[in-house]
């Protein structure tokens, strides 16, 4: 009986080693094409959320099969809806939700509306309102305004900053807009 076990142990170890190698082959790094596809699908799912608007900002990072969600939202349910939508995408195994829910504040709500009117009421900026969700997002936290997203030109970026900075009750304006050269 001892000789059978002596031969069986190395054979078992060999099979376990081969199975581990096959499993590791199945866990390859995602290809660049699959990463680009995932990025496009994540963006699509986020912008299609029903309550996503100009006062919310989503950012995300795709790393392999993990998606990290970041940004700011005005409604708590939008944070959870974003996570649910991204989890349903084929190829996403894990979602880290780092989205900040902005505090409720009547003063911040007033500033949001005033900054929106100041930016999008300008004759040079009206074309941005033709989009379902304008590309310049207005984030207000405790009286501080953050402009996020994209502007078509450097002039639009600067004009948005000047308009937001001229609103009464705004403590500061941080212009995080990038110029979209497409």
Segments (PLM) and residue ranges:
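N-terminal targeting leaders
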Residues: 2-10, 14-182
């Amino acid at each position: 009986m001892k000789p059978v076990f002596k031969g069986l142990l190395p054979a078992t170890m060999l099979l376990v080693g081969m199975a581990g190698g096959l499993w590791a082959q199945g866990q390859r790094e995602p290809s660049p094409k699959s990463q680009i596809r995932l990025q496009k699908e994540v963006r699509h799912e986020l912008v299609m959320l029903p309550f996503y608007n100009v006062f919310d900002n989503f950012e995300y990072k795709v790393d392999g099969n993990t998606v990290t969600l970041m940004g700011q939202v005005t409604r708590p349910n939008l944070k959870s809806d974003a996570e649910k939508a991204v989890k349903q995408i084929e190829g996403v195994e894990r979602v880290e939700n780092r989205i900040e829910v902005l505090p409720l504040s009547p003063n911040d709500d007033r500033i949001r509306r005033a900054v929106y009117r100041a930016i999008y009421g300008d004759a040079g900026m009206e074309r941005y309102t033709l989009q379902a969700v304008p590309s310049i997002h207005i984030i207000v936290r405790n009286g501080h305004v953050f402009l996020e997203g994209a502007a078509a030109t450097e002039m639009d970026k600067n004009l948005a900053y000047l308009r937001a900075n001229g609103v009464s009750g705004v403590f500061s304006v941080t212009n995080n807009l990038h110029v979209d050269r497409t």
